[in-house]
From Swiss-Prot:
Belongs to the AccD/PCCB family. The gene is accD. This is Acetyl-coenzyme A carboxylase carboxyl transferase subunit beta, chloroplastic. Residues 198-466 form the CoA carboxyltransferase N-terminal domain. Its main location: plastid. Acetyl-CoA carboxylase is a heterohexamer composed of biotin carboxyl carrier protein, biotin carboxylase and 2 subunits each of ACCase subunit alpha and ACCase plastid-coded subunit beta (accD). NCBIfam families: accD.
Length: 466
């Protein structure tokens, strides 16, 4: 663990908005961190740090809390807090596991209640802290503060305060410094690797997005609006009304039909490892549910499972879904995210293209039902050459990578240069390859309107059984 100290100074309005405090921060002294390599008997000497109550003026101060520091700060660390009465408290944070432990908790609780219980309360009752009389509620509040702070600060890289005589009333200044007895750069790298599962880097602008908040934003990058990859479960949750999802053929698994030989890892072992990693049996989830009350049959491919490759199980599940939708007169949605046919199953994977296309022919041409294909990044290979491009309406996500063969394969095979961006959704849209480009935010509403236009209306009851 590293030794941290920082001087945190917030205005009453700013702090009250972020963490629900109704008092200024001059009641708390600078916060220190216990280094695990140091003597645990600490000397709390006064530090010559300007307090907020000094009324000191600051000009052109850089906000040093940059995005790269956040993964280091939110590791499992122990901080020492000293109040204005001289009492000290040891607070241990494990943000990843949501653990907050307070040493000398009784004194800390008394100070907390005396400081914030009898004083003036904020105008917004949601932020009053006089109610916090249990460790559980305090833990929840602290975790809520951290989430709120990260949410509001994560897009800030370097912020320079404007020239003003009243910085104390309007701005936040966090000066975070690290001192360590080991190599600081190596230590930071170690901490970053340890907690990188808390952050997701945008593939387009390379900014970090806080994983916990990213899901609520439909996995759309805060900085550039790029649509990051989603799991099949997240897409189902995004599109299907809560409590209406009924999965189909969940127990269907591949049996290594051609006994594919691999020197690195047997096919069955690879399947098993992806099943454990994703919780899925194969690269597609199929089922029925309601979309804004409208009964639908939906299949969602998952790129996290062997690159969304299409084998015999994927082909069979989608075929059965199309046949079920045909028999029940349901609209059909297939969300594509695939690298193409699965080479470990040879020609059996290729024949899935014809099998699915045959089922869709009966669904569309004979039954005159409505099939919507949604292309996400990436959609390539055998999926593009079959059911991905057979929709009555073909929708693409923004900036999706859509192709039959990859850029490298084309260039090596044809000995020609593939123009940059020629396999992206916007370029292909101009060429008429599909219909609309729809972002994730309005997608559910767009699908609902399309279904209504084709005479599919919501049910009054919750069940979609016929």
């Amino acid at each position: 663990m590293e030794k941290w100290w920082f001087n945190s100074m917030l205005s009453k309005e700013e702090l009250g908005h972020r963490c629900g405090l109704s008092k200024s921060m001059d009641s708390l002294d600078p916060i220190d961190n216990i280094n695990s390599n140091e003597n645990m008997i600490l000397n709390f000497t006064e530090k010559s740090i300007h307090s907020w109550s000094n009324g000191s003026s600051y000009s052109n101060l850089d906000l040093l809390f940059i995005i790269g520091d956040i993964p280091n700060l939110i590791s499992d660390e122990t901080f020492l807090i000293r109040d204005r009465k001289g009492e000290t408290y040891s607070v241990y944070f494990d943000i990843e596991n949501k653990i907050v432990e307070i040493d000398n908790y009784h004194s800390f609780s008394n100070y907390w209640n005396s400081s914030y219980g009898t004083g003036s309360k904020s105008n917004d009752t949601h932020y009053d802290l006089y109610m916090y009389d249990t460790k559980s509620s305090l833990n929840n509040h602290i975790n809520g503060c951290i989430d709120s702070y990260l949410h509001s600060q994560m897009r800030l890289d370097n912020y320079v305060l404007r020239d003003s005589d009243h910085y104390g009333d309007n701005y936040i200044f966090d000066d975070i410094k690290t001192t360590t007895k080991t190599n600081g750069r190596d230590k930071n790298l170690e901490v970053t690797k340890k907690y990188r599962n808390l952050w997701i880097q945008c593939e387009n602008c390379y900014e970090l997005n806080y994983k916990k908040l990213l899901k609520s934003k439909m996995r759309i990058c805060d900085e550039c609006g790029y649509h990051l990859k989603m799991s099949s479960s997240e897409r189902i949750e995004l599109s299907i009304d809560p409590g209406t999802w009924e999965p189909m053929d969940e127990d269907m698994v591949s049996t290594d039909p051609i006994e594919f030989h691999s020197q690195e890892e047997p096919y069955k072992d690879r399947i098993n490892s992806y099943q454990k990693e994703t919780g899925l049996t194969d690269a597609v989830q199929t089922g029925i549910g309601q979309l804004n009350g409208i009964p639908v049959a939906i299949g969602v491919m998952d790129f996290q499972f062997m690159g969304g490759s299409m084998g015999s199980v994927v082909g069979e599940k989608i075929t059965r879904l199309a046949e079920y939708a045909t028999n029940q007169n349901l609209p059909l949605i297939i969300v594509c995210a695939s690298g193409g046919a699965r080479m470990q199953e040879g020609s059996l994977s290729l024949m899935q293209m014809a099998k699915i296309s045959s089922a869709l022919f009966d669904y569309q041409s004979n039954k005159k039902l409505f099939y919507v294909s949604i292309l996400t990044s990436p959609t390539t290979g055998g999926v593009t050459a079959s059911f991905g491009m057979l929709g009555d309406i073909i929708i693409s996500e923004p900036s999706a990578y859509i192709a039959f063969a990859g850029k490298r394969v084309i260039e090596e095979t044809l000995n020609t240069t593939v123009p940059e961006g020629s396999q992206e959704a916007e370029y292909l849209f101009d060429k008429g390859l599909f219909d609309p480009i729809v972002p994730r935010n309005p997608l559910k509403g767009v699908l609902s309107e399309l279904f209504r236009l084709h005479a599919f209306f919501p049910l009054n009851q919750n069940s979609i059984g016929q």
